[in-house]
C-alpha cells in the first residue's frame, strides 16, 4: 500500500517520463531486450531496429497507459482494467 508521500513521489518522477513517452518508452523496451533477449519473441512482428517507428509507437502507448495508472493511484485496478482485458484476450 502506497502512502500519500509515496504517491506524490511517483507522480513527480513520472511527470518527467510522461513528457516524452515515445523516447522513454522506447528506451525501456530496448533495455528489456538487452537484459532479457527472449522477450523479443513477443514483438516478432515489429521492426526491432533502433529508432523503429513501431517500437516508438508501442512504447508511447505503454507509457500513456502507465500515465493513466499514475494518475489513478487510488484506483489502479479500475485504471488499468481495460488494458488488462485487452492483453488477456490476445
Swiss-Prot record:
Chain ranges of the Globin domain: 1-90
InterPro entries in alphabetical order: Globin (IPR000971), Globin-like_sf (IPR009050), Globin/Proto (IPR012292), Hemoglobin_a-typ (IPR002338), Hemoglobin_oxygen_transport (IPR050056), Hemoglobin_pi (IPR002339)
Keyword Protein transport carried by entry: no
Source domain of life: Eukaryota
Keyword Iron: yes
GO (cellular component) term, any one: haptoglobin-hemoglobin complex
Tissue: Red blood cells.
A single BP term in Gene Ontology: hydrogen peroxide catabolic process
Subunit structure as annotated in this protein's UniProt entry: Heterotetramer of two alpha chains and two beta chains.
PANTHER family in alphabetical order: HEMOGLOBIN FAMILY MEMBER, HEMOGLOBIN SUBUNIT ALPHA
The protein, known as: Hemoglobin subunit alpha-1
Amino acid at each position: 500500500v502506497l502512502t500519500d508521500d509515496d504517491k506524490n513521489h511517483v507522480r513527480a518522477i513520472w511527470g518527467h517520463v510522461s513528457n516524452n513517452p515515445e523516447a522513454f518508452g522506447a528506451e525501456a523496451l530496448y533495455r528489456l531486450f538487452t537484459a532479457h533477449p527472449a522477450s523479443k519473441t513477443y514483438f516478432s512482428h515489429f521492426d526491432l531496429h533502433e529508432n523503429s517507428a513501431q517500437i516508438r509507437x508501442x512504447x508511447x502507448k505503454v507509457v500513456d497507459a502507465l500515465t493513466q495508472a499514475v494518475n489513478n493511484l487510488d484506483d489502479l485496478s479500475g485504471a488499468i482494467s481495460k488494458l488488462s482485458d485487452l492483453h488477456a484476450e490476445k
